[in-house]
A protein has these predicted regions:
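Helical hairpin unit composed of two closely spaced alpha helices linked by a short loop
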Residues: 2-45
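Short, ordered loop/turn segments at secondary-structure junctions
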Residues: 10, 48-49, 84-85
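C-terminal regions of RecA-like/P-loop NTPase motor modules
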Residues: 1-2, 19, 31-39, 52-145
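Short, active-site-adjacent cap segments at secondary-structure transitions
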Residues: 12-14, 50-54
Length: 145
């Protein structure tokens, strides 16, 4: 049977009975968490990070940065972020805006990270270095320089 469900873009969930977006998000988060437990399935919910995350001291998103409602972080069993640091922090760009490597050639893979910030079922936090292969829209590992 089905063991995993995916919900793309949590902030698009709306409920007619909710008076505010925050109320709708809090209710949806709780309902999804309960449903996962009752059906004994994993429900992966993709959510947007608020703009304030870019102002974090380390430049990385944290649980409090999930846009519109922090209930998502409280109700989940695992919380992870795919993060692509600002490329300008690492590499210059050519006249077309494409990042360049040390050899002056366009980069095919740019820096990225998979950040585990909560894991109630495992080892806890982790930072995994990845690369983002833009031509294919894929995250790859390990990062080769």
């Amino acid at each position: 049977g089905v063991r995993r469900f995916y919900i793309d873009y949590a902030q698009k969930i709306t409920l007619r009975r909710a008076k505010t977006k925050l109320e709708a998000q809090a209710y949806a988060s709780d309902l999804i968490s309960q449903t996962a437990q009752e059906l004994n399935v994993s429900i992966v919910v993709l959510a947007q990070v608020g703009r304030a995350a870019t102002k974090n001291p380390n430049g990385r998103p944290e649980a409090v940065d999930i846009a519109d409602c922090d209930n998502w972080a409280r109700d989940c069993g695992q919380l992870a972020f795919l993060h692509r640091p600002a490329i300008d922090d690492f590499h210059p760009r050519n006249e077309f805006g494409i990042p360049l490597g040390r050899d002056g050639q366009p980069l095919r893979v740019t820096p990225a990270e998979f950040l585990v910030r909560l894991n109630r079922f495992g080892l806890g936090e982790a930072d995994v270095k990845l690369g983002f292969y833009g031509e294919r829209g894929a995250f790859v590992s390990p990062v080769l320089e």
